[in-house]
Amino acid sequence: EAVRYGEIYESSELEILAAFQAVKVPAVVLESAAVRRLYHLPETAANSPLRLYIPEERYYMARGYLFDLGYETDQFYTGFGEHMKRAGGFQVEIYHHLPFLTKNYKKHMKSLLDRAYPDKKYPVLKVLSLESSYMFRMAEACYHFCTDNLKIRELLDLYLFYKLFHKDMNKKFLDARIKELDISLLSQSLLHMADMWFSSRKDSLFPYPKDSISLYDDMEARILSNGTVGADSIPEAAR
């Protein structure tokens, strides 16, 4: 199924982006087929959707064009957007508001979108810089951890992104955004835990945390149980 999905992923994605360009529907690309390039074997990536942020005043127009392309809504995100799917299997998520409830997150995540720049091929659409794309993933992972909705695949995608690009990113920019979101300890802890999960001692990015292993045990329990067990060892996660 993953191989088959990969064959239609990029063509279906480009069909949507080209349609939005043709009818001048603006959008910011939050996640795309590029996630498959994080994996040594692209077919081992999840069958994840194209994710788009669309200004509220153009949202229903965009939604209508997706209906015309054969997409149907199979899940609503009340107050934020919806998940759509086509018979061939390709999925797209569209948002008119970013899916975060806290005031601080809304403010600073929106500022990431405001930094997006026009795509070279489809200039009516905007894309995130390398740093903003990483920050969106990290901030969303932290938010999902705090709301007990963090999936292992999401954490793996984040870790592979960091592993592949951390030397190319502007650390000063990342540190400033992490401080704004108040996720300094949580973001670092998620990366360290992912490193323990998804790497070997030989290719690990971080030293083994001998003195704080109980913290990672609690975090692991919380993720694997969707919050039914696992102490709040990180104060940031309780806010």
Question: What feature does the model see in each segment?
Answer:
Residues 1-48, 54-239:
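Conserved NTP-donor binding/palm subdomain of two-metal-ion nucleotidyltransferases/polymerases, i.e.
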